[in-house]
Amino acid sequence: MKTGALFTCLVAGTVLSGAAQAADLVVGLKSEATSMDPQFHQLSTNTQVLLNIFEGLTNQDALQKVTPALATEWEAVDDTTWRFTLRDGVKFQNGSTFSARDVIYTYCRVPLVENSPSSFTIYTATITDVKPDGDNAVLISTDGPNPLLPTDVANLPLLSADAAGAEDTVTYKPGGECEGMGTVPQSADFNSPEITVGTGPYRLESFVRGSQMVLTRYDDYWGEQPDWDKVTLRPLTSDGPRVAALLSGDVDMIESPPIQDLPRIEQAGYSVVDALSNRIIYLAMDQDGEAPSIGGTDGKNPLLDKKVREAISLAINRDAIVERIMGGYAQAAGELLPPPMFGTNGRAVDAYDPEKAKQLLTEAGYPDGFEITLGTPNDRYINDAQVAQAVAQMLARIGIRTNVDAQTASQFFSRRNALDFPIYLAGWSASSGEMSSPLKSLVATYNKEAGTGPTNAGRYSNPAMDELLKTAMTTIDDAEREKMLQEAEQMVLDDFGIIPLHYEQTVWALKEGLTYEPRVDQYTIASQVHAAE
């Protein structure tokens, strides 16, 4: 790894001489948002662009500390009730006044979003009631203590009830049974700027899939005005064209420049900033019955056997991946979040031991291995397809003949959510900045109604872990909750229910005169890009 510990490695963008002259900013992104609907898909690509338009009751800063946004303060009234004081004088981009009605409408809509690849119900599952408290506050009740509610609501961007066509009065009821919702707009409707209405510093001008997203400054924004009149976000999914666009001046900033190109970029006078992120790159495995797509097993699913899953982990040389594939811009992972984040326990990285891996396969009844397909995106994570190819080669050395099926992110996520892959490579960035996020999303037993395991496409299930996690999430005492999260994570990792590979280190490249503070969550937020003074 090229920098220090997680929280000390964050550095501000280098300030170079001269200020940016243009009032417009063009950013080259490594992947494209799947929707303009802020409640459709828990995907950082979506979140980072929509944070320019929408805001929640709370926000998270570059280190994921919870800060005020549309709520100026909050307090726990009792074990199951929180009171959020709403910011006065806030206007949506359509001119309507922000009020408790918009909060109620937003939280009501979450379970009504159709065909969500990764539902936001994970943040609303405990909410039993949302109601006004006077003219400038809301009371949010939960079905048990929820110490993370102020963090959860940062992940629920608030919609304009007027723009969505709600009735004058919206009454909250759990499970999508709210009253006064009107005809609820779905994801495709948010391609229209008339529906995509928030309170943020930018408004949506246009979104052309495969081409660009254009934002214009919202002059009546309640907070600090951004530096740019117009922002254009272009998906440049191939590394070469993305770097070429920067060096030619077609874009002002890019995310995830290839590691091997950094010297050339810096020599050309551009600044480079980087930070270790909280994103874990991991392998998930089909642990839900038979897997006919796996060859050489007489129809059995070898991934149901813990010994096979452990063999896969021991076959992977994480240090080699970090150095050879990631160029040192990553850190080998032993947990679902990098220490010292809340809930980590310092578990060691699984040792590279191919001989023991072969022995475990033999003990499991697969001395000759088997054949399997590894699914991966090829444009979503840093060097994702290359990492998958390296993993495939390592697995082949212990007898697991691995075919890599690499696709664009949109194709990959669609197939992953259809449970097409017996094993797949993906990533997760903890929106809460602590261990409950990956546990609830990646390894909790899948239950659509309960909002658990929305991204658990391997269908791993550990009822004891589920129960411990449930208890942790209703424990107010931080020390006790952390112990429970540590134990819950240990249960999953001891079971090899999921295999951590590495934590990404995120890199940005900017033209002269621009600055950007790297974020732990890896977001590229245009409104936070500044012209050097």
Listing of model-derived features with the role each one plays in the protein:
Residues 1-8:
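Bacterial N-terminal signal peptides that target proteins for export
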Residues 9-10, 20:
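Cleavable N-terminal signal peptides
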Residues 16-22:
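Sec/Tat signal peptide C-region and signal peptidase I cleavage site
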Residues 28-78, 108, 195-199:
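N-terminal lobe/hinge region of extracytoplasmic solute-binding protein
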Residues 60-62, 87-118, 129-131, 196, ...:
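Extracytoplasmic/periplasmic ligand-capture domains
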Residues 75, 121-180:
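Surface-exposed binding/hinge segments that line
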Residues 328-348, 507-511:
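Mature extracytoplasmic/periplasmic domains
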Residues 508-533:
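Long beta-strand-rich cores associated with HINT superfamily self-processing modules
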